[in-house]
Regions:
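Acidic, small-residue rich beta-repeat scaffolds with periodic aromatic anchors
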Residues: 11, 22-33, 119-261
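Beta-propeller blade termini
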Residues: 38-47, 91-99, 198-204
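Hydrophobic/aromatic-rich structural module bridging two neighboring secondary-structure elements via a short loop
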Residues: 91-113, 120-124
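C-terminal motif of bacterial Sec signal peptides marking the signal peptidase cleavage site
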Residues: 18-20
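Short glycine/acidic-enriched loop and turn motifs that connect beta-strands
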Residues: 61-64, 113-116, 219-222
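Acidic/hydrophobic-patterned starts of short beta strands in beta-sheet-rich repeat architectures
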Residues: 49-59, 99-111, 206-215
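N-terminal, intrinsically disordered, polar/charged segments of Gram-positive cell-envelope systems
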Residues: 7, 22-46, 68-70, 77-80, ...
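Positively charged n-region of N-terminal signal peptides that target proteins for export
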Residues: 1-5, 10-12, 22
């Protein structure tokens, strides 16, 4: 009888040990700074809104092809590492800002293209119960929009525009006076939509939460000839930013067509 009791106790102890092991979380590995890295930017702020400050550092280095890679670190732990998208981005910086209206600050991680289109990338990260979550990330395209959009000159100073992703379409009317002496170039208008070059963060409805609007220029006969802008608005839903609407806006700021997403 005593032997049976001892065996039962040993089995119970082993079971508790195994359960304990299964519930243990793996420890985070500390970020290792190498000789190839340099500090691009460092900020010290109260991220949680609890009166205690944290250090956020953006490191930069070059990969095997000589392209920049940036790593975002909070204290001694990596948040994320982003590359240059095959050379599309050459510069980067960070900004700490409360965008979702909750207690604390989010990290806005910007990357920049230094070409004439001025493309930008933006990823936003939020510290939630000790873990970093990405709450905003919109892919940016540097192919002049040819995979997604279709543009064609229709004659009579009109350009058809269609977005295959959202179904948004419109006929853009041009101002004839802008093309005096260059009318022959109008037939050359084809698909040309710049990458996202601006992110407008604004609390549109005054609820304490910032909406984000991305801005892309729609190009006519040359890059110096924008004929409209494509603006997509994102709103926080279920903890992250989701697209709400897309608008085609003329160069005077008037909305030509809008579609809910």
């Amino acid at each position: 009888m005593l032997k049976k009791i001892i065996v039962i106790c040993l089995i119970a102890a082993l079971a508790l040990t195994l359960v304990g092991c299964g519930a243990t979380k793996a420890k985070k590995e500390k970020f290792v700074v190498t000789d190839n890295m340099e500090v691009v930017e460092k900020q010290v702020e109260d991220l949680n809104g609890d009166g205690k400050t944290q250090k956020v550092i953006l490191y930069g280095e070059k990969d095997d092809q000589g392209m920049p890679v940036w790593t975002l670190v909070e204290e001694e732990y990596e948040i994320v590492s982003l590359d240059s998208m095959e050379g599309a981005y050459t510069l980067a910086d960070i900004n700490l800002q409360d965008v979702d209206g909750q207690k604390g600050l989010e990290v806005l991680f910007y990357r920049y293209n230094t070409g004439s289109a001025g493309g930008q990338g933006l990823n936003i990260y939020k510290l939630d119960r000790g873990e970093w979550q990405e709450i905003f990330n919109v892919p940016n395209s540097f192919d002049m929009g040819k995979e997604r959009f279709t543009m064609q000159y229709m004659g009579n100073y009109q350009v058809s525009f269609k977005d295959s992703e959202t179904g948004l379409e419109h006929v853009i009317k041009l101002d004839p006076s802008r093309y005096a002496g260059n009318e022959e170039m109008l037939d050359g208008i084809s698909t040309w939509v710049d990458p996202i070059a601006e992110y407008k963060l604004e609390d549109i409805d005054s609820d304490g939460v910032s909406e984000i609007t991305t801005m892309q220029m729609v190009i006519g006969i040359a890059h110096a000839d924008p004929i409209a802008s494509l603006q997509t608005t994102y709103r926080v839903k279920d903890g992250s930013y989701q697209p709400e609407k897309i608008s085609l806006v003329d160069i005077s700021g008037m909305v030509l067509v809008e579609k809910a997403l």
